[in-house]
């Protein structure tokens, strides 16, 4: 029975990928034209170039509502799509990027750190109201921008999850009071999360949640671990944008790794692409790690010291590159 169930899940994953017919790449920005913070800055000239590249390559440009409809099956995608998102709600999005998006007719979503609204470097409620009237989407990026999983080093999991929920609902309440609208999308602060945070989001009526794991999105990934491509500094170049738009979503049979006592063990049965000719494993703490490929399954193992890592599984079928990133959280890490 277990063998039949496993085969059914593999078949379902493949079928989902075939039916989806398209990938979605979610762009992530923070600040615009702000030389004070180069690590989170994108120049508006670069933003304009990104928009032109997306249109030149004939990608659809979606709202997050379009993405929601696609994830839940009420929207079909006949070609690849891009979604533009901006995190934190810095004032530079209003002062610099807003007019660029408007001039090109490009929708975008701002994930707001609600507790920062009105401070000198951040949007005001008046700016937010104007942007809403002009079709800009807004979503929840927490009240306090806390690194929630990191709290597990000093409190229990239940305490951390209660803290997360309290913060989440405080942001919801304030936004509803100030705008009359309810946010149904969430971006994890710093892109850090554990699965139980996603469960709380679902319980509270959220429909999508976004990480900071790079890579294209496939519907088989689900609604609460949607990857996004940060486009800043060296990653904002034309060559990088063209590269990330060329990559395809990699699909695995199940969660492809376990972490136990600081040892990351990878055993990833790759479903898409169907025939893997070459595969690599990359861990942010270590770089490329030693791996072997056998019957479309890639194996690898390494010791980790840091609290957060990202695991990348990359594969080629001779024509294209397929990849997926995973957040690896080590509660005992540094």
Positions of predicted regions on the chain:
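Bacterial N-terminal signal peptides that target proteins for export
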Residues: 1-9
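Bacterial N-terminal signal peptides
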Residues: 10-18
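N-terminal pre-catalytic segment of deacetylase/amide-hydrolase enzymes
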Residues: 22-82, 245-255, 299, 313-334
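Catalytic cores of secreted or luminal carbohydrate-active enzymes
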Residues: 219-253
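Beta-strand-enriched, solvent-exposed domains that form extended recognition/catalytic surfaces
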Residues: 249-334
């Amino acid at each position: 029975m277990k063998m039949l169930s496993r085969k059914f899940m593999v078949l379902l994953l493949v079928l989902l990928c075939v039916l989806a017919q398209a990938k979605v790449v979610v762009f992530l920005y923070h600040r615009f034209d702000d030389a004070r913070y180069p690590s989170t800055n994108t120049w508006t000239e670069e933003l304009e170039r990104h928009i032109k590249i997306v249109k030149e390559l004939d990608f659809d440009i979606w709202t997050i509502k379009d993405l929601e409809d696609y994830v839940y099956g009420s929207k079909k995608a006949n070609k690849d799509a891009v979604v533009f998102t901006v995190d934190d709600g810095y004032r530079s999005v209003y002062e610099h990027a807003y007019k660029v998006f408007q001039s090109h007719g490009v929708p975008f979503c701002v994930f707001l750190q609600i507790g920062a609204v009105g401070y000198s470097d951040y949007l005001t409620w008046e700016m937010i109201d104007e942007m809403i009237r002009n079709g800009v989407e807004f979503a929840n990026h927490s009240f306090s921008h806390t690194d929630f999983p990191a709290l597990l080093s000093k409190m229990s999991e239940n305490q951390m999850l209660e803290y997360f929920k309290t913060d989440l609902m405080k942001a919801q309440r304030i936004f509803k009071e100030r705008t009359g609208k309810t946010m149904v999308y969430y971006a994890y602060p710093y892109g850090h999360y554990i699965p139980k945070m996603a469960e709380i989001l679902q319980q509270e009526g959220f429909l999508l949640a976004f990480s900071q794991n790079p890579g294209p999105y496939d519907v088989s990934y689900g609604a609460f671990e949607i990857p996004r491509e940060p486009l800043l500094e060296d990653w904002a170049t034309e060559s990088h944008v063209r590269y990330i738009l060329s990559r395809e979503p990699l699909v695995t049979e199940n969660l492809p790794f376990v972490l136990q006592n600081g040892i990351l063990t990878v055993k990833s049965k790759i479903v898409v692409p169907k025939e893997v000719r070459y595969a690599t494993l990359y861990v942010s703490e270590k770089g490329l790690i030693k791996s072997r490929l056998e019957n479309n399954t890639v194996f690898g193992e390494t010791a980790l010291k840091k609290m957060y890592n990202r695991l990348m599984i990359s594969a080629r079928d001779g024509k294209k590159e397929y990849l997926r990133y995973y957040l690896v959280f080590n509660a005992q890490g540094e």
